[in-house]
């Protein structure tokens, strides 16, 4: 039976219900994306490279302004400061690594002042005697994983900031995957290799190349926003789009019939098939593109 009637389309239930669903979904997307409703609960471990190359292998330059080390620490503090403004701040843990690993924070904290005090207390020139000057990425990742395993109920992100050339044992990457930890990299002043990209992609993380002067901006903006992106926002927008397609059922039918001179029964079928197509295609697109994963809560 044709959907077309001479009455205005907004007087029919299919239009009204679809319009209401569209409005609700858009409001939910706004609340989740802009106002912080339904936030992800995230634990973040920041592994900071403190090897010799970050201070030009000279104790006189240890954590001095302009060095990579100073830029890394400034970036961590900027992340912690912005994080404190969230309604549900990330729990942050920080470690430093070179030939060995040293914890900088005592467990997790969302207090930027506490994190800054811990950094000032631990990151001193005498630290070189404890951690050496190399880059042992296996130890850095294993330590970060052990730390994040203490927060099993939260979404877990590990970020490694390094200017070194390194390798990671495959079994360590497998352990990271097994515990649903996303491994992310900021590679400072070095080319981003295919292997680093692969390690990040395997665990659902990202790998970015960055200049020393841009570490703070990248960490406190792009990386921060990615860690705190709400996975429900694409879902709400997807439902909004589906609702819009159903809301357009009668308007499309009338357009096909009156503007394109298609028979009313065919116009009705085309408009219904169009709505059904987008109802099926939209969730497939969201899942295939990685915008939404129904099998993961993070």
Question: What does each model-identified segment do?
Answer:
Residues 38, 56-58, 85-125, 137, ...:
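Short beta-strand-loop
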Residues 46-50, 96-98, 162:
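Flexible glycine-/small-residue-rich
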Residues 57-69, 101, 105, 123-134, ...:
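Second-shell loop/turn segments in exported
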């Amino acid at each position: 039976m044709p959907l077309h009637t001479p009455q205005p389309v907004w007087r029919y239930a299919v239009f009204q219900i679809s319009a209401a669903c569209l409005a609700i979904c858009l409001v939910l997307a706004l609340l989740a994306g802009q106002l912080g409703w339904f936030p992800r609960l995230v634990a973040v471990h920041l592994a900071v490279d403190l090897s010799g190359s970050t201070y030009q292998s000279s104790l006189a330059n240890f954590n001095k302004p302009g060095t990579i080390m100073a830029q890394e620490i400034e970036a961590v503090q900027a992340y912690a400061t912005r994080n404190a403004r969230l309604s549900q701040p990330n729990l942050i843990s920080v470690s430093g690594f070179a030939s060995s690993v040293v914890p900088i924070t005592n467990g997790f904290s969302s207090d930027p002042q506490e994190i800054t005090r811990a950094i000032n207390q631990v990151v001193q020139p005498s630290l070189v005697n404890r951690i050496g000057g190399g880059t042992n990425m296996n130890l850095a990742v294993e330590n970060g994983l052990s730390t994040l395993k203490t927060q099993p109920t939260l979404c877990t992100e590990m970020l490694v900031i390094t200017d070194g050339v390194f390798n990671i044992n495959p079994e360590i990457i497998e352990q990271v995957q097994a515990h649903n930890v996303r491994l992310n990299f900021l590679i400072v002043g070095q080319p981003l290799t295919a292997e680093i990209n692969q390690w990040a992609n395997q665990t659902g993380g990202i790998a970015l190349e960055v200049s020393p002067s841009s570490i703070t901006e990248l960490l406190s903006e792009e990386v921060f926003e990615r860690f705190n992106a709400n996975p429900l926002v694409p879902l709400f927008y997807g439902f909004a789009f589906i609702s819009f397609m159903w809301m357009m059922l009668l308007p499309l039918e009338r357009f096909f019939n009156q503007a394109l001179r298609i028979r009313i029964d065919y116009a009705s079928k085309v408009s219904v098939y169009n709505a059904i197509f987008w109802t099926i295609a939209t969730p497939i697109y969201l899942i295939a593109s990685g915008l939404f994963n129904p099998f993961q809560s993070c």
